[in-house]
Amino acid sequence: NTVDWSDSSIETVTFKQEGTNFTGSLLVGHATSGTLNAAENNTGVGIDALDALTTGDSNTAVGFQAASTLTSGTNNTFLGKEAGKIVSNSSNNTAIGGNSLFYNTTSSNNTALGKNSVFGLTGADNTAVGYQSLKGVANQNGNSNTALGSGSGLAMTTGANNIFIGKSSGDNITTGDGNVIIGSINADSATGDKQLILADGVDGSVAWIKGDSNGQVK
């Protein structure tokens, strides 16, 4: 079913619920509201939200152009302006915040909470909590990273299996793997692997413990 209405404050709004190819789905947009084809149990609210969805099921997108290019992914949640905008065929992702998980096209199992979190990474199994956490660079395949704190893991590109805890922790690491950075501090090397740093959580001026890839603690 489609309903259009106009008044002094609403120019043109399109509303679709149930009906052919809309089983269990609800789309509310502006001028158009998607073209579901054998897709079920989806909810899209906002201009162009879920606009390209064809066969994906159980997706929720709320916000201007949220998941606007998603075609066949399942079990995704995107909340915020352009959250998951470039996602096309990904599943089991959660992105909350404007531009979160923006460039992730086909990878799954990511969690991004905070504006610009996991903005550029296209990898899978990343978890980021905080403004610009794991923001990265557009179309870089970082995988299995965890970042907790505003700006943590900010510069990540192709690094994997890293853990960053604290505001701006490890925000210089780009391609390093298996690093653990706790506290507001940079890693010794942006490309190094298996670096361990435990620092104070204020400004990172004091590193209490450091370890290297050989298991040596400094």
Question: Language-model segments: which ranges?
Answer:
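Glycine- and small/polar-enriched repetitive beta-structure motifs of secreted/surface proteins
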Residues: 3, 9-218
